[in-house]
Amino acid sequence: MLELEAGHLRATIHPEAGGIIASLDRRGPDGRLHKLLHAPDGAMPSTAAPNMMGSWVMAPFANRAFDGVVDDGVTRFLVPENNPRGGGNIHGFGWQSAWAILGHTGSHTALEHRRSAGPDPYRYRVRQEISLDDSGMTIALSITNEADQALPYGIGHHPWFPCAADTRLGLTASGALVFGEAFRAIGSEPLAEGGPYAGKPVFATGRETAWSFLGWDGTARIETPSTGLAITLTASESLRCPVVWAPAGADFLCVEPQSHAIGSPSEKAAREAGPLRRLQPGESLDGWLRIAPEAI
């Protein structure tokens, strides 16, 4: 386990378990630690199922490849199924892999995950740099195609944020996927006036929430008056297809900056709305996100 500290912020990272940022805490004026990422007491990261905590990399694509299919309209192949609930591959391979430590200081670390073998053509290198400063955490991502052919790629990060009964989410987007069964896209639609979170409503609805937004402006704000904290999430232009998800009654919410829409690896409607990026051998796809807390 690695620890990073800067000012009032502290993070723990597990390179051996998907390079996960297992916790990010802020020490308040009262000396107490306030969790900025959902991290249940005593929970340890696993590579058996996607971790419902912290924040972690999605690569070489984000979210679902239904039935294990990757098809960008040019190249089609199968990837191993890894979703414990069935139905294909979820979030790629990075979250299940051990990451090498390239460097580590008190407030910064660089990690790398490399895939050089497998039953599918994916061969790549992913680099994740995590930096803390006095006001927040910045995560820089880069994936490089190391295969001998052009292939479709995507990246993303999957933060899990604490959510209370009074938590509000603010996010503006111009469109979203339309889901059929099991989050499989059947089309896309424009959103009037910035979408359902433009007015920063209370997030909790008592039912499952699932959105794959398009045309995001790159900023989301999560405010929880009962804790006195707000979190601002920002992301690069390359990660402007965020997923917002939470099951009914959850004490967390997910806002996942990613480079493509849910199901783009396998679903034509998703691919047409927010496609993967086709990388030539040696070409890279980069992105960044930042999580910044403040008192309210």
Predicted regions and their residues:
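Acidic, contiguous internal or C-terminal segments within carbohydrate-active enzymes
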Residues: L4, A11, P15, H113-Y153, ...
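A conserved acidic, glycine/proline-rich C-terminal tail/linker
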Residues: C254-L276
